Amino acid sequence: MAAAAENLRTEEIQLNMGPQHPSTHGVYRALLTLDGEKVVGVENIIGYLHRGIEKLAEDRTYTQVIPYTDRLDYLAGMLNNLGYVQTVEKLLGLEVPERAEYLRVIMAELSRLASHMVMVASMALDLSGWTAWFPPFRERERILDLFEMTCGSRLTVSYMRIGGVAADIPPGFLPALESFLNDLPRMIAEMNGLITGNEIFKARCQGVGKIDLETALAYGITGPNLRACGLPFDLRKARPYSIYDRFDFDIPTLNNGDSYDRFVIRLLEMEQSARIIRQAMEQLPDGPVQAKVPRVLKLPRGEVYHQIEGAKGILGFYLVSDGGSKPYRLHIHSPSFVNLGALPRISVGGTIQDFVVNIASIDIVLGEVDR
């Protein structure tokens, strides 16, 4: 029998996962090469959601580009808006009113919270944790209600404007926000009770999809996925933009760089976003929410690159102006695209079951990948 076993040969097979698959979190296709259940090769096949946003921007005024940014990471529209309008303002040398800066921070951190809630809920659901799906989505609904109250939309918000924001917050906004922040710790405690300490969840995630700090840096990984590898790097602290230097908050880190830590780090970051929002509410000044800018902007000739700390990592905009009213060139550096590039590295050698965990833990949005 032993001799016969030694002569057994296995044959590798190729398996298409996606582009329509509940665990790919969008129209993403992975071509897996399998030896039994072991993953020996992963090929990322993207482009199914490519809409040509960068090219479309060349035929739109600077203000008309704003709605397109909502459709990058459509789970964090406020952050996309912020990164783009600050890029334009940087080239213009435009100063934004104080109240608008505080409102931008509040909306950006709410957007970060909403994105992290989708990640932790979806990852739990991918591992059949149906009950754990509900608490994050329950609280996320309240964030979307706040967005709708302010700008009339829930996902594609188009709230930021070059020089400020589209409108001031309505009278009931701050009480509703205060109520949400008071209830947020309960949701985090629920997730810790249902998932973080769950032995089955730990068995499925700890040590799975592990990436060390050196490799993460080599791939250009940023954001929560990098901080899960132990590096406390966050643009809000390292190179503060807007008014983030006025707030007191920590940068949570974990050290294992595996799927479990990538899940937990987002729960920890939710607490810090809530801290920032509370401070912004306390310091919120009166005043205008929009600087005086022409209806049709013409930027000076030049180029600029600006980065912000997005929900999934560093989000960057490279803008070239020829002196006209439309961008000559706009390039978007999207963290989901970078994070997806590391997926084969963390998946080869694991099992096909682990691949589902890895996709969920790196937290990609295909609108941002394909652009």
Curated annotation (Swiss-Prot):
Entry membrane topology: Peripheral membrane protein
Record's subcellular location: Cell membrane
Annotated EC: 7.1.1.-
Location (main, coarse): membrane
CC per GO annotation: plasma membrane
Cysteines paired by S-S bonds: none
Keywords: Cell membrane, Membrane, NAD, Quinone, Translocase, Transport
PROSITE patterns named in the record: COMPLEX1_49K
Record field: catalytic activity: a quinone + NADH + 5 H(+)(in) = a quinol + NAD(+) + 4 H(+)(out)
GO molecular function, one term: NADH:ubiquinone reductase (non-electrogenic) activity
Biological role: NDH-1 shuttles electrons from NADH, via FMN and iron-sulfur (Fe-S) centers, to quinones in the respiratory chain. The immediate electron acceptor for the enzyme in this species is believed to be a menaquinone. Couples the redox reaction to proton translocation (for every two electrons transferred, four hydrogen ions are translocated across the cytoplasmic membrane), and thus conserves the redox energy in a proton gradient.
SUBUNIT field: NDH-1 is composed of 14 different subunits. Subunits NuoB, C, D, E, F, and G constitute the peripheral sector of the complex.
Family, per entry: Belongs to the complex I 49 kDa subunit family.
HAMAP family noted in UniProt: NDH1_NuoD
UniProt-recorded name of the protein: NADH-quinone oxidoreductase subunit D
